[in-house]
Amino acid sequence: MKAAKKHKKQKLWSFSLLCLLMAVGAPAGVAQEASIDRVVKQRMSANKIPGVSLAVLREGKIVLLKSYGLANVEHQVSVKPETVFQSGSIGKQFTAAAVMTLAQENKLSLDDKIAKYFPDVPATWKDITIWHLLTHTSGLGDYPSEIDLRRDYTEAEYFAAFTKTPTNFAAGSSWDYSNIGYATLGILIGKVTGKFYGDFLQERIFQPLGMTTARVISEADIVPNRAAGYRLVKGELKNQEWVSPATNSTADGSLYLSILDLAKWDAALYTDRPLTQSSRDKIWSPAKLSDGTTKDYGFGWHLAQHHGHRLVFHGGAWQGFKSFIIRFLDTRLTIIFLANSWETREFKFARELVASFYPEFALPAVNTIADAEPKTTALARRALIQLMTDKIDEQLFTPDCRAELGASS
């Protein structure tokens, strides 16, 4: 009897495993693809996004690869899977991965203080460790206002400006998203390896994984399939603003990537190359503060538990580009998109895409309320616009209001 039950369980287990294996890498369903098409086209129309590149993967295998719109509006070049976009801050996960490869080789420790590599840092930096920089718990903030993004600083000049910036809190005591923290990590990688951090990424991550178009940004170089970035100015589409080559070479998110490059990256995160299981566990663990509380951020990844799912994600925004990657660690589903418009609402866009697979993530519908007094509403709207433009029709306001506004009655 026990043997028969055991045999039955084995058959059930084998059948379940077969179903799982068939599901992994299976194409997205017709309804899901139609839903994604609808979401992308609605978002592109609403936010005037020229082009989008999108991939859906299960366990590192592409199940849906889509291209929408234009990579370059002026030349009417369509987006394709090989189109290269700017990364924005999703580039931080590659900086973190580079640091972790060095930690795996015992070339540095996450507990090392920055002063070990930069002895002349100010006293406020003395307690900052590599771990603090990775988790945004260093107390460092964003780029100081004195930095001119159009000026071509040397790496030493950048770092000198960083160290003059006051810290916001003691290292490890709180959390504050810090671009200069990740830019500092890039400089540190150079100190440890003797190589520019972008060259180290090429050698240790991009080339081994076959990410053939991934690289540090260079607007001067000839880059095949490069998309143009755009912004809206008073509703009109404009080219991205120019920044200096030095500004586009920092480790806080200055990469070129295609959707195919990111698909290969996602696949690699299911293997021990380049990151071991121990390293992957660390990059997706919440940062623990000195008071014992935690923040939902690992090393270059936001963390969340949502609707029973464990997920990691990050967005990016830079020079007329937006990007997003979200990975469900439990169901092994990944959704990635790259867009060439600053107006892309990347977090809302991502949630709408996720809802194609998990309806519980859908944003709640907004219930409209019937206006019982539309004429009064129209008058109020007109008065508000006048207040905003300083062109006031006195007859819309009571004598007391006119007195407050300084208008003569």
Stretch-by-stretch model annotation:
Residues 1-10:
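N-terminal secretory signal peptides that target proteins for export/translocation
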Residues 14-25:
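Bacterial N-terminal signal peptides
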Residues 27-31:
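Sec/Tat signal peptide C-region and signal peptidase I cleavage site
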Residues 33-87, 107-112, 155, 164, ...:
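Short, conserved catalytic-motif segment at the N-terminal edge
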Residues 45-53, 74-132, 167-180, 250-253, ...:
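Short active-site loop at a secondary-structure junction
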Residues 70-73, 125-319, 324:
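Short, surface-exposed loop or secondary-structure junction motifs
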Residues 313, 324-341:
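Short, well-ordered beta-strand elements
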Residues 339-406:
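Short, gly/Ser/Thr-rich active-site loops of penicillin-recognizing serine hydrolases
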